[in-house]
């Protein structure tokens, strides 16, 4: 596996409204574990669409991993131009920082937002251009990642395409592990 697409929930879907929420570090730790293992097995590129939440947290994790594995690259392929246009200023600044550190940035449709079709095109692009999908996703709470997860599963039925998931139970295990370590 050379290229993995990473996605997951938007912050509000997780009840997270600030990047210093303790849940963010838990999610980043889970992403770090998975991505580091994939890098050790030959992963070269992580691709995201730049949406707030799991995708931008994954970008931060990639930057951390690059210290030890400088050959790992991050690409941000936005579904449309200026997707951050309606965001709050602090979210725009955070997003622009991520873009400034990414190894490659491009827009899939190369147009500003026109219709939901652009999100469908984004999902198709990500599944076509990657060897696997890593999603912070639980079928009990479908949310925004539902459509790309369905597309990945469909591709996996006909081709050698893998979907990897970080479930809520995985995040709970990390929380309990942290509590156990802090109690010692």
From Swiss-Prot:
InterPro entries xref list: YspA (IPR010697)
Pfam family, one: YpsA
Chain segments annotated as coiled-coil in the UniProt record: none
Gene3D superfamilies membership: 3.40.50.450
Annotated transmembrane regions: none
Membership in a protein family: Belongs to the UPF0398 family.
NCBIfam families xrefs: PRK13660.1
PANTHER family: UPF0398 PROTEIN SPR0331 (PTHR38440:SF1), UPF0398 PROTEIN YPSA (PTHR38440)
Protein's name in the database: UPF0398 protein BALH_1408
Organism: Bacillus thuringiensis (strain Al Hakam)
